[in-house]
Structures are given as structure tokens and as C-alpha cells.
């Protein structure tokens, strides 16, 4: 009885076995900073944050605001390359995207102000002139960019704060899956990726940022500070080719 193989009971008419099944470790070596790692693929998940139209596509929210979205599009190619390889190793893929309610009842004034600081122009939940409502769940802007195609087996989680752990089911899902190590990809590295990674670390997860699979439209020093702080305080930094190499050497995946 249970929704995930790592967290089930065995139930009969007169007794219940609460002993969870042992999940066989599937370790692989991973080049990372500040130290090399040994990671258990059986207890890992790969989280892709906010690779959605409002941040990464022409006609989306950032493009409407005049932001150069080139840095947010840069991770698309490496994410598209590594996700199938990670999936083939039976590592869960989690697509974590912004999506506020259309009535904005899950958005506070402080959150609304951050997206329209002068109170003018389109902000959260409002419609871009000639376009879709901004970051509304189910809207075009909340959809994953066309270049990244989730598999039906992948997991989707909607968030409405910068951190994907705040008031969402993400932590429950990961604990049901038995995950202890989380890989992070997506945008913006210094904002939603970083706050999600920080909350994960505070909750006791092992955190690995995949450097070539994250991007930000912030100034370069913001990315440098993000990588510095991840390595100093919150976890580790690796590259997607290192993940692929480690999985291949351990003969994990297809």
C-alpha cells in the first residue's frame, strides 16, 4: 500500500508490515566542486526549474519587459541533452514551473510588487498586450518551452513563489520517492533555482547545481556569487557531461 516503491506498507487482514523495502543502491562517481562525489542514482532526482515561455521565449513576460532572454535560453540545449540520459538511469525528472491562480489569491502584495514595482504595466496574472496572462497556471506563459519535451513518466509541480518547496507538494513527492540527492537545472540561477536549492538543503537534501544547465538574466556577478555560495554553503556544482560520464562508467541507463 503506497504510491512509491520506497514508501509502502504490506497490508493483510490482520496485520500490517511497516518495514519499508530496501532500495538497492546504484552508485556512480561524479566530478564536482568543491569535492568529487559518489552519488546514488536510486535516491536522486533531477529538478528543472522554470524553463517556461514567460522566461525563455519570445513574447513571454521577460521579453515583454525588454529583458534579453538569451541567457535564459542558453540552458535549453544541455538540458535537452542530459534529461533523456538521466531518465534512462531511472532518475525521476521533476519539471517545476511558476503558475499562480488566475484570481491571484495565492499571491501577496509583496509578490505582486516584485513583478510590477511601479504598479504600471502588466504584472502577475495580467495579460501581456496581445499575449497571454503572465505566469498563470495553465497559460501559454506557464508552459515548458517547445524545445524541452517532458515524458509522460516525468513529474510536474506548480509553484507560486521563488522556492519550489514553499506551500507545494514537492517535498512530499521527493520523500515518497526516497530521494536524498537533488540535481538542479533551469532559470534563473540566482533566484528561483537558488531559493529552491537553499530550501532543499535546509530540509536535509544533498544539493548539486548543474552549472551548464542553469542560466540567469541577472548581471554576471550574480551568477558568480550563486556558484560561489552553492560551493561554500549549500552543496556542490557539477556539469552535465560529468553526469553523463559518471552514469556511463557505472553502466546505468540505456
Positions of the model-derived regions?
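Active-site-adjacent betaalpha module
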Residues: 1-45, 54, 72, 81-89, ...
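A short alpha/beta connector and helix-capping loop motif
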Residues: 42, 59-86, 91-97
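Short beta-strand "acidic-cap" motif of Rossmann-like dinucleotide-binding folds
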Residues: 48, 95, 209
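Active-site loop/turn elements of alpha/beta-hydrolase fold enzymes
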Residues: 51, 98, 212
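Short acidic, Gly/Ser-rich segments with clustered Asp/Glu that frequently serve as metal-coordination loops
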Residues: 52-58
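Short, well-ordered beta-to-alpha junction loops that form the rim of enzyme active sites
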Residues: 96-99, 187
Amino acid at each position: 500500500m503506497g504510491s512509491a516503491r520506497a514508501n509502502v506498507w504490506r497490508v493483510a487482514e490482520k496485520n500490517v508490515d511497516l518495514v519499508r523495502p530496501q532500495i538497492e543502491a546504484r552508485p556512480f562517481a561524479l566530478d564536482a566542486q568543491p569535492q568529487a562525489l559518489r552519488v546514488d542514482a536510486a535516491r536522486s532526482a533531477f529538478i528543472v526549474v522554470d524553463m517556461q515561455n514567460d522566461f525563455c521565449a519570445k513574447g513571454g513576460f521577460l521579453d515583454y519587459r525588454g529583458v534579453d532572454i538569451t541567457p535564459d535560453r542558453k540552458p535549453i540545449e544541455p538540458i535537452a541533452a542530459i534529461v533523456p540520459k538521466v531518465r534512462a538511469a531511472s532518475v525521476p525528472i521533476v519539471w517545476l514551473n511558476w503558475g499562480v491562480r488566475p484570481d491571484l489569491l495565492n499571491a501577496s502584495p509583496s509578490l505582486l510588487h516584485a513583478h510590477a514595482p511601479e504598479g504600471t504595466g502588466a504584472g502577475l496574472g495580467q495579460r501581456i498586450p496581445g499575449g497571454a496572462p503572465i505566469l498563470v497556471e495553465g497559460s501559454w506563459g506557464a508552459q515548458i518551452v517547445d524545445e524541452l519535451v517532458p515524458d509522460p513518466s516525468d513529474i510536474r509541480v506548480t509553484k507560486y513563489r521563488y522556492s519550489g518547496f514553499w506551500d507545494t507538494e514537492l517535498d512530499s513527492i521527493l520523500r515518497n520517492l526516497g530521494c536524498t540527492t537533488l540535481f538542479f537545472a533551469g532559470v534563473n540561477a540566482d533566484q528561483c533555482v537558488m531559493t529552491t536549492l537553499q530550501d532543499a538543503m535546509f530540509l536535509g537534501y544533498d544539493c548539486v547545481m548543474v552549472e551548464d544547465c542553469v542560466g540567469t538574466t541577472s548581471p554576471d556577478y550574480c551568477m558568480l556569487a550563486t556558484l560561489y555560495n552553492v560551493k561554500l554553503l549549500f552543496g556542490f556544482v557539477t556539469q552535465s557531461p560529468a553526469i553523463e560520464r559518471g552514469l556511463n562508467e557505472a553502466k546505468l541507463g540505456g
